């Protein structure tokens, strides 16, 4: 009943998830095997999103675009998106163990699947979009484009999940650290980006408190271009985090 022809503006949490280095992985499979691999990847990832009240917008090869808070209202949409991203990495670890065993059984080389995720929250136009002949329920807007850009930043910064400042502010119960202030294509104002590292349990852990305190100093020295101090703080931050990430 809440579906409407055309579009409406709504506050939405958006996710882009993409497989890294998929070209190298695809070379290990024939077309049928590659299709099976994609399906094995998309199925558990989709289930996580749907279990947390997300809507799959579309699949683009090995990429998933999803959003929360439409067509059904989800008051906790920011938290649902963040939790989905974290759980997806747990499911990916399980899938890679299965794929590694399959590769060993078939005497085939194994490359683990690795993904990057971008999350953003903002006002989007959501509704039935397309032509008179065919339309899809989808979202449009600058915040959708930004989310795609955030996913692309995950590899460059060496983190799993990159989120916007808007998402970070709306989800204070999650463990995050600032990554940078970047200029994104198509935007005139620099965008502050963060890495999502964990849930409330991580946020209250001693290792995260220690690491995030050092990391805040690191960001400050980095912005002041005190490179020597920044490098020393990188070592301290890594030591505080240990093998957590």
Q: At which residue positions do the language-model features occur?
A:
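Catalytic strand-loop-helix junctions within cyclic-nucleotide turnover domains
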Residues: 67-77, 117-137, 154-157, 197-200
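Alpha-helical scaffold within the catalytic cores of cyclic-nucleotide enzymes
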Residues: 38-54, 70-117, 142-155, 175
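Helical mechanochemical/support elements of P-loop NTPase systems and associated helical scaffolds
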Residues: 8, 15, 34, 41, ...
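Cytosolic regulatory/linker segments at or just downstream of nucleotide-handling modules
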Residues: 124, 147, 153-220, 236, ...
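Catalytic NTP-binding/metal-coordinating core of nucleotidyl cyclase/transferase enzymes
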Residues: 3-84, 137
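Solenoid-repeat scaffolds in large eukaryotic assemblies
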Residues: 227-233, 237
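Regulatory cytosolic signal-relay segments
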Residues: 1-9, 93, 98
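Short helix-adjacent coil turns
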Residues: 218-229
């Amino acid at each position: 009943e809440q579906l409407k022809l055309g579009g409406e503006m709504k506050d939405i949490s958006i996710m882009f998830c993409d497989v890294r280095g998929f070209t190298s992985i695809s070379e290990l499979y024939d077309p049928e095997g590659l299709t099976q691999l994609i399906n094995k990847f998309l199925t558990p990832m989709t289930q996580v999103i749907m279990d947390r009240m997300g809507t799959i917008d579309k699949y683009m090869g090995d990429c998933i675009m999803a959003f929360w808070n439409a067509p059904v209202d989800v008051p906790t949409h920011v938290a649902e998106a963040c939790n989905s991203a974290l759980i997806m990495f747990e499911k990916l670890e399980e899938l890679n163990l299965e794929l590694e065993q399959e590769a060993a059984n078939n005497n085939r080389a194994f490359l683990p699947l690795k993904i990057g995720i971008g999350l953003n929250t903002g006002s989007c136009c959501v509704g039935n979009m397309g032509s008179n002949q065919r339309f899809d329920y989808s979202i449009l807007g600058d915040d959708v484009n930004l989310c795609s850009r955030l996913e692309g930043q995950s590899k460059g910064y060496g983190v799993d999940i990159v989120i916007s400042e808007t998402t970070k502010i709306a989800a204070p119960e999650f463990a995050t650290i600032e990554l940078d202030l970047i200029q994104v294509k198509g935007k005139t104002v620099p965008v502050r980006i963060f890495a999502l590292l964990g849930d409330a349990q991580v946020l209250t852990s001693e290792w995260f408190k220690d690491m995030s305190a050092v990391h805040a100093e690191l960001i400050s020295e980095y912005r002041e271009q005190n490179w020597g101090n920044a490098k020393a703080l990188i070592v301290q931050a890594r030591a505080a985090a240990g093998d957590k990430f």
